[in-house]
Amino acid sequence: MNLGTPEEPDWKPITVGISTTETEIEEEAEDYYYMDGRGTPESEPATQKITRTFTGHRKIGDPVQDMVFDMMMENLDKRATEIVEYYDIIPSGTPNGKKYPATVAVQNDGSGEAQMRADISFSITKTGASEKGTMTFTQNKYTWAKSEDLRKVTV
């Protein structure tokens, strides 16, 4: 998650205290009926909503959790962010992820029983197109680089 700005990003992993992630994809389709098809619909996807939910335990001091539960939860105007989903097992030099704009929603802020750890849950919903690229981690810092266009046309 980008805790900085698009111009000066500060990427931090959404992993500390997180035990489970779940992706929900909601799609709606439009059906079109034509006489030459004798009333059989042609169906096209019309909308898509992709949401990833993170659940686990509250870890005060983690930059991502502190941003979500201390700032974003209190200020609805601060819910927009950028996300990079990447796979660190892909060899270097190869695009390993995608970056996209998203909004954050809080489902559980850590309330619960006194003898238990504070259960948390928040989600990110994709709000725009993805761009492919490479996330690297060197010198204790995450860096994102957009991929060059891999589609080369030969005539």
Language model segments and positions:
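Solvent-exposed edge beta-strands and adjacent loop segments
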Residues: 1-55, 59-60, 103-118
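Extended aliphatic helical segments
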Residues: 16, 64, 68, 84, ...
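A generic structural signal for solvent-exposed, polar alpha-helical segments
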Residues: 17, 38-40, 92-93, 106, ...
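Extracellular/virion structural assembly segments
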Residues: 38-101, 132-137, 141
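Mixed-charge, glycine-accented linear interaction segment located at domain edges/termini
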Residues: 102-155
